[in-house]
């Protein structure tokens, strides 16, 4: 019934009324850096790619990176509660930890566990680039499902400052600021910071009578300097900490702190472009009960990460580009690491990886071909070789077809190996074909994909503990995205159909077979309005070898809305309502999702 209502609503909009061309699809001036690790026009990227701009993030009033990502075609989000609680981001049905997560091109994934999508403050984000499909031949381990790159810097050097204050349901409060200053010598300084706190709500099912809150603080500073027309450099520091309340036989606390320092030097000549980048991260994760307290936390993990990159791209001639580069990464778990009050089995362990890659991009008239090969020397799993090949043919100015093929791998995490030291690395073979067509009234993109995964790591519910195992799996799907305008309203409509199962024929948990999205964005005079509809089909709650009705999450339809009113060119007031129809639902078994929530925000720029 819910899907029928959506179809009726869509049909009502497709009456012949003053259509505009769907301008948002892939604008010619949009530039991305993730697809080949250097800037290139989005129109020249073969892989399925979505770019979310700062303007879109602000207008939709996204409170977290999860709010940004759940609007992206092909992405499904699952969360164990509300703001700040653990979450998974599934790209085309792949595991959340099979996504390579970058901030300004630097890897954030840690072998100590999963990715925290909650800890990147949206206030410092300039744009988010999502590349779907294997990225192992350029980036190495973890990029099986794709790459998410959060960009916090901008090529624009315009000056300005922004201050925003917000409040909402569950006693949520937030404040953020940012300022950018451009200097006559070619330098650009950016400073930002903010805090957020909420009392939360009772996330457990059955309910415990307790609220589980969240609080965080963040600071960010960057400075870039153009030395001349060819050489430039930059340095940045990013810090955040957070405290999350969660349930584990009573109220428990998860504390995280992250410090990241990055510096790079870039050369951009008429033919050669090069980047030398270094990054150091210090990560601390604590888990403790009320009785233990923070100073006596039972689980303590401190991780030191070092990343070095040397990237090069050379234009041989018009339409022929080659790339080459090397990455070195080292990760060390502290000698005093604890797990549930006992010394961690992998305390003091370190792992390092050295990767080298070659790539090429050929433009042969209407035919474009890209390819890359990479070798990663892992100190535990020896050498892994990956490759990718992509091609696109421009049939006419408005119609094109594409195909991509590639391999990728992911090494087990520290947590995986602690619970099963015999685990093997995951390996995947991915295939995709696609079509993009621009018509008078709309633009459509269709992608069909087929992925085979060997040694997929799945955590199963055991007694008394969960445990990981290697299984083989296949993930197939069809992704259809349409763009069109009615008057001043821009529409994005997404339909996703997935077939995902392990070698025993069992569905993979938390992934629906069907997902639908309808995004409506409008700007009229002083108003910005956004309306989002998402439908998520039935799915398993936890991995099981046999079907169990108690293990199924029912389908759900959700509406979110936001509106902004510009009081003056410098002052805007915004309001947002999540879960307009107040649906009661879960995206993780035994964890309640938020009911209807209200937020308001006042932003002043000067």
UniProtKB/Swiss-Prot annotation:
Superkingdom: Bacteria
Entries under Gene3D superfamilies matching the protein: TonB-dependent receptor, beta-barrel domain (2.40.170.20), TonB-dependent receptor, plug domain (2.170.130.10)
Entry keyword Acetylation: no
Motif (TonB C-terminal box): 589-606
Name recorded for this polypeptide: Vitamin B12 transporter BtuB
Signal peptide stretch: 1-22
Chain ranges of the TBDR plug domain: 41-153
Short sequence motif TonB box: positions: 29-36
Residue ranges of every copy of the TBDR beta-barrel domain listed in the record: 158-606
A Gene Ontology molecular function term of the record: porin activity
Any one biological process term the GO annotation gives: monoatomic ion transport
């Amino acid at each position: 019934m819910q899907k029928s209502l959506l179809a009726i609503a869509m049909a009502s909009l497709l009456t012949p009324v003053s259509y505009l061309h769907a301008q948002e699809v892939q604008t010619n001036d949009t530039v991305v850096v993730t697809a080949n690790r250097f800037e290139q026009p989005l129109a020249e990227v073969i892989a399925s790619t979505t770019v979310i701009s700062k303007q879109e993030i602000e207008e939709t009033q996204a409170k977290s990176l999860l709010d940004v990502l759940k609007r992206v075609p092909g992405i499904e989000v699952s969360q164990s509660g509300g703001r700040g609680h653990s979450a998974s981001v599934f790209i085309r049905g792949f595991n959340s930890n099979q996504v390579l997560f970058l901030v300004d091109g630097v890897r954030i994934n840690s072998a100590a566990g999963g990715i925290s999508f909650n800890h990147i403050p949206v206030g410092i984000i300039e744009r988010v680039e999502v590349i779907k499909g294997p990225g192992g031949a350029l980036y190495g381990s973890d990029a099986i499902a794709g790459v998410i790159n959060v960009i916090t810097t901008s090529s624009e050097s315009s000056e300005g400052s922004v201050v925003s204050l917000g409040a909402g349901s569950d006693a949520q409060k937030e404040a953020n600021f940012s300022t950018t200053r451009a200097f006559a010598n070619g330098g650009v300084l950016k400073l930002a910071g903010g805090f957020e706190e909420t009392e939360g709500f009772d996330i457990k099912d059955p309910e415990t009578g307790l609220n589980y809150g969240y609080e965080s603080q963040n600071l960010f500073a960057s400075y870039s300097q153009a030395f001349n027309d060819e050489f430039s450099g930059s340095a940045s520091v990013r810090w955040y900490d957070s405290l999350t309340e969660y349930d584990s036989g009573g109220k428990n606390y998860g504390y995280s702190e992250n410090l990241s320092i990055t510096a790079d030097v870039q050369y951009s000549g008429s033919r050669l472009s090069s980047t030398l980048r270094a990054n150091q991260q210090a990560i601390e994760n604590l888990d403790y009960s009320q009785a233990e307290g923070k100073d006596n936390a039972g689980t303590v993990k401190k991780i030191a990460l070092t990343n070095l990159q040397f990237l090069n791209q050379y234009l041989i001639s018009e339409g022929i580009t080659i790339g080459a580069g090397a990455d070195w990464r080292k990760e060390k778990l502290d000698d005093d690491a604890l797990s549930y009050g006992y010394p961690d089995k992998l305390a003091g362990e370190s792992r390092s990886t050295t990767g080298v890659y070659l790539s090429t991009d050929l433009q042969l008239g209407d035919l474009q071909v890209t390819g890359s090969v990479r070798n990663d020397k892992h100190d535990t799993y020896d050498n892994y070789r990956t490759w990718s090949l992509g091609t696109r043919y421009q049939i006419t100015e408005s119609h094109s077809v594409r195909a991509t093929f590639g391999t990728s791998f992911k090494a087990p995490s520290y947590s995986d190996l602690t619970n099963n030291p015999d685990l093997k690395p995951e390996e995947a073979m991915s295939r995709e074909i696609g079509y993009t067509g621009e018509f008078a009234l709309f633009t459509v993109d269709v992608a069909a994909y087929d992925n085979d995964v060997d040694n997929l790591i799945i955590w199963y519910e055991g007694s008394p503990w969960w445990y990981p195992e290697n299984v083989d799996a296949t993930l197939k799907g069809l992704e259809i995205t349409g763009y069109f305008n009615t008057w001043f309203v821009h529409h994005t409509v997404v339909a996703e159909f997935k077939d995902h199962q392990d070698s025993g024929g069992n569905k993979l948990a938390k992934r629906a077979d069907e997902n639908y999205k309808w995004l409506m964005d409008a700007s009229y005079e002083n108003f910005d309005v956004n309306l989002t509809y998402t439908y998520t089909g039935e799915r398993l709650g936890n991995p099981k070898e046999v079907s169990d009705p108690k293990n199924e999450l029912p389908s759900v339809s959700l509406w979110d809305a936001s509106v902004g009113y510009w009081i003056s060119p410098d002052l805007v007031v915004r309001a947002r309502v999540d879960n307009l129809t107040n649906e009661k639902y879960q995206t993780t078994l035994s964890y309640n999702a938020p009911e209807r929530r209200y937020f308001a925000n006042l932003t002043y720029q000067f």
